[in-house]
Amino acid sequence: MSNLGKSTGSRKDTKMRIRAFPMTMDEKYVNSIWDLLKNAIQEIQRKNNSGLSFEELYRNAYTMVLHKHGEKLYTGLREVVTEHLINKVREDVLNSLNNNFLQTLNQAWNDHQTAMVMIRDILMYMDRVYVQQNNVENVYNLGLIIFRDQVVRYGCIRDHLRQTLLDMIARERKGEVVDRGAIRNACQMLMILGLEGRSVYEEDFEAPFLEMSAEFFQMESQKFLAENSASVYIKKVEARINEEIERVMHCLDKSTEEPIVKVVERELISKHMKTIVEMENSGLVHMLKNGKTEDLACMYKLFSRVPNGLKTMCECMSLYLREQGKALVSEEGEGKNPVDYIQGLLDLKSRFDRFLQESFSNDRLFKQTIAGDFEYFLNLNSRSPEYLSLFIDDKLKKGVKGLTEQEVESILDKAMVLFRFMQEKDVFERYYKQHLARRLLTNKSVSDDSEKNMISKLKTECGCQFTSKLEGMFRDMSISNTTMDEFRQHLQTTGVSLGGVDLTVRVLTTGYWPTQSATPKCNIPPSPRHAFEIFRRFYLAKHSGRQLTLQHHMGSADLNATFYGAVKKEDGSEVGVGGAQVTGSNTRKHILQVSTFQMTILMLFNNREKYTFEEIQQETDIPERELVRALQSLACGKPTQRVLTKEPKSKEIESGHMFTVNDQFTSKLHRVKIQTVAAKQGESDPERKETRQKVDDDRKHEIEAAIVRIMKSRKKMQHNVLVAEVTQQLKARFLPSPVVIKKRIEGLIEREYLARTPEDRKVYTYVA
């Protein structure tokens, strides 16, 4: 020990320094300490540790390490543990291969762990100093490594352990009861022997387990498919997945759940997706046909687990949906009722919306597929825009449909879904304008609110440009009401008489309404013509510089009609006359609601009893097509609307046919609406061609306007880029074909709005 004392001549505090004196241990003494420790370790391994002083053993180990004999202690420990595990433990386990193998191995493993904890406690100082300084495994881990290499991974023990575990799981899968605890203990042991990693568990158990499982499920899938319907197969696969998850939870390491579930999914689902989906009388189509929402939900849930599962389902659903849709919109049978046509599509949409909600969890892929399919088949039939407009027309017309406003609103919302799928929105707009005009002018709208509500839906969908004309029609109706009030006031003030005609005039703005520039001719009878002339003079006096052109095809009239003949049955006996106003013995009075053309024809019969087709044509000057349609309505319609008779009694109207008033006409209704033939069936082919021509003319202007707009802002553009941009701008209204766009570009070049560049004829410049 160093001397202690004060230093003189220094004011610093003195520090005491203690230097350890060198202690040397001779080899003999070291060996005696090691023998003592070795004996103690062996006693612990033999479970004879009750007489040992752990404090003394710790001190001895401490002394060895302190005097730099840590390596001797570490090496000695490894040899003692190895010797015990090879000579005693391994032999015991080998002897138990055919008898209580897992229990023996588990017991040996538990004993070894207990022993290593005690040994670790004795050699704690070595762990802290020697192990740290020399970067070797600590005492406990060293024990694990030796147990792993000398016992668990020893040739036949390793193979037998693997095979035993696999056999037990295979037996359990077949329904036998096995010792789950033994499997769990073995798996936990393999995980611990991996020292923070999974390699031992993975190599010695998991990899072969997954391989065996794949083979098992491969065979099981064949059996399941051969014996079960799609829905039962799906339920069995679900049960199998749950069973495997439950087995992992109780027996294996939790990290095995994901790989084993993937194996089940691959073998039972992925490899057989098409087979399951296309199963005859039980697959996806069968489920869709029979509305099996729960089975579809099970299939969706199962297929969502695997790559391309939902895609496979979607493709199959899409084929079926397109087939159904094509059948609904097929152009066969021209006599299709537009209301039934659209209702059929709405019913189909409702069915698939239900599947989407209840079976497919509102999945985006299914949603997009259904929308794409509806867009595909709805646009296969060129009449779809007209039929949709007629469907809405039917719902917005007055009539006994027994629908509340909320129900009408709901139907219109559904109709708007179909409208979104429609590529030719401009064609729909043209028809909608015609049908709205008819409702407004004949006062047939169920309510202004419903009409405006529908227009606001269209506005939300397509913007105000789309609905500006429709809104203009409403403004015209409002202004016309005011004008008529003023006109009636004028008649009262001036005392001018309209000669018994109750006249209502609607002044329509050209451009808003489906007016015709070349208005069909029609010789209006004198009394209504005289009444209109009085209105014309009144209106033009107020609005100088305006022009009024009568739109005969849009007008209507209420005619007082008197029928004089007795109404007879086929046997000649007379019958009652229902709702007619009877004056005199057989005279019946009705109010006939007719078109302007029908009024002009009927009023001829105030002058003569009979007219031939040619005579009517000459007198009225109505164009032949309109005349034929009007006469068909009056003479060939339902018996309750047949106010004229014709000879011969055929459905066709031809020259030489003779027409007379049907004096036997009767109806239960006092007010009789004469339906225009085929109004509900949509336009005839010539009319449709005419409408299509008008649409094409409008499109030319819209395409040119879009080209000019784009070129004005870009100045210079390549042909394909310009075509793509024009298509993008116009697709909300219609899809212009590249050929038509090219023609319009050429037209603009001719008119010098655009020019080709000299270096590249496919590049255009804007000519200011």
Curated annotation (Swiss-Prot):
Name the keywords, alphabetized.
Answer: Cell cycle, Cell division, ER-Golgi transport, Isopeptide bond, Mitosis, Nucleus, Transport, Ubl conjugation
UniProt GO BP: cell migration; COPII vesicle coating; embryonic cleavage; endoplasmic reticulum to Golgi vesicle-mediated transport; integrin-mediated signaling pathway; mitotic metaphase chromosome alignment; negative regulation of Rho protein signal transduction; positive regulation of mitotic cell cycle phase transition
Q: Which GO terms describe its cellular component?
A: centrosome; Cul3-RING ubiquitin ligase complex; cytoplasm; mitotic spindle; nucleus; polar microtubule; spindle pole
Q: Which PROSITE patterns match?
A: CULLIN_1, CULLIN_2
Q: How does it assemble?
A: Component of multiple BCR (BTB-CUL3-RBX1) E3 ubiquitin-protein ligase complexes formed of cul3, rbx1 and a variable BTB domain-containing protein acting as both, adapter to cullin and substrate recognition subunit. Interacts with btbd6.
Q: Name one Pfam family in it.
A: Cullin
Q: Which modifications occur after translation, per UniProt? A: Neddylated. Attachment of NEDD8 is required for the E3 ubiquitin-protein ligase activity of the SCF-like complex.
Q: Which family does it belong to?
A: Belongs to the cullin family.
Name of the featured protein: Cullin-3-B
Q: Where in the cell is it found?
A: Nucleus
Q: Which GO terms describe its molecular function?
A: ubiquitin protein ligase binding
Q: What exactly does this protein do?
A: Probable core component of cullin-based SCF-like E3 ubiquitin-protein ligase complexes which mediate the ubiquitination and subsequent proteasomal degradation of target proteins. The E3 ubiquitin-protein ligase activity of the complex is dependent on the neddylation of the cullin subunit. Involved in ER-Golgi transport by regulating the size of COPII coats, thereby playing a key role in collagen export, which is required for embryonic stem (ES) cells division. May play a role in the regulation of mittotic entry via ubiquitination of aurka.
Q: Where is this region: Disordered?
A: 677-698
* Origin species: Xenopus laevis (African clawed frog)
In the UniProt record, does the keyword Nucleus occur? yes
Q: In which pathway does it act?
A: Protein modification; protein ubiquitination
From start to end residue, where is composition biased (Basic and acidic residues)?
682-698
Keyword Ubl conjugation listed? The answer is yes
Where's the Cullin neddylation domain? 698-760
List the gene name: cul3b
Query: Where is the Glycyl lysine isopeptide (Lys-Gly) (interchain with G-Cter in NEDD8) crosslink found in the sequence?
Result: 712
